[in-house]
């Protein structure tokens, strides 16, 4: 996200100022005008679209159950039922665990989710394939795997407060240019070892 933001800023001819916050506070920062937009793999949802505007999607992913490699009990999404999952409170992935009647162990972030799975304190965590690809890129010897993957594609985009039409229009134009030039694919391959900038 940082590299995509820098590429966008360069394309737009502006300087970017990063504000690092916890996931659960990201969107709240938009509400309080702490920053102009959020670029942190925010999934486009009907609920969020009621209150916010989104750029065109810049990454695509799928929900995935991430477990230890030796876990043989969880092989499909419905296997969530009756198992413990580490999840951040406001993520879309917590809703998946609730839907399949799994038990949620609340955490603050992805790193904590992974840590609890690695320690065997939970059976797994549900997140997107992007998070797992990034984990493997940073930690190739990880003891975790994708045990099951959902079929619903998730589109991630930059998120803005409604009414920032000029900013949205310019960001969309810049994203299209970065896609066309191959820059988004290049960044994607660098961090995920696969191109997630297209469906």
Task: Map each language-model feature to its residues.
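Bilobed "Venus flytrap"/periplasmic-binding protein-like clamshell domains
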Residues: 1-10, 62-110, 114, 129-133
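Acidic, polar ligand-binding/catalytic clefts
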Residues: 2, 6, 10, 15-79
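Extended ligand-binding regions for polar small-molecule ligands
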Residues: 2-11, 71, 89-91, 155-194
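Alpha-to-beta junction loops
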Residues: 13-15, 31-40, 84, 118-131, ...
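Short helix-initiation/N-cap motifs at beta->coil->alpha
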Residues: 17-28, 72, 90, 105-119, ...
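A ligand-binding cleft/hinge motif common to bilobed small-molecule-binding domains
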Residues: 25, 42-50, 96-99, 123-153
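Periplasmic-binding protein-like
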Residues: 60-67, 133-176, 194-199
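Ligand-binding clefts/hinges and TM-proximal coupling segments of bilobed small-molecule sensing domains
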Residues: 92-107, 143-148, 173-199
């Amino acid at each position: 996200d940082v590299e995509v933001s820098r590429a966008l800023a360069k394309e737009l001819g502006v300087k970017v100022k990063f504000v690092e916050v916890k996931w659960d506070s990201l969107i709240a920062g938009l509400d309080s005008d702490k920053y102009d937009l959020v670029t942190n793999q925010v999934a486009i949802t009907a609920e969020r679209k009621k209150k916010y505007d989104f750029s065109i999607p810049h990454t695509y992913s799928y929900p995935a159950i991430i477990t230890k490699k030796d876990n043989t009990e969880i092989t499909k999404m419905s296997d969530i039922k009756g198992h413990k999952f580490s999840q951040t409170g406001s993520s879309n992935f917590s809703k998946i665990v609730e839907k399949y009647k799994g038990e949620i162990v609340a955490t603050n972030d992805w790193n904590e989710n992974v840590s609890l799975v690695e320690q065997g304190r939970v059976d797994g965590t549900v997140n997107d394939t992007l998070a797992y690809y990034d984990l493997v890129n940073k930690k190739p010897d990880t003891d975790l795997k994708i045990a099951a993957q959902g079929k619903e594609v998730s589109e991630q985009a930059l998120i803005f407060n409604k009414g920032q039409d000029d900013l949205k229009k310019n960001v969309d134009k810049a994203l299209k240019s970065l896609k066309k030039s191959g820059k988004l694919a290049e960044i994607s391959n660098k961090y995920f070892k696969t191109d997630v900038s297209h469906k």
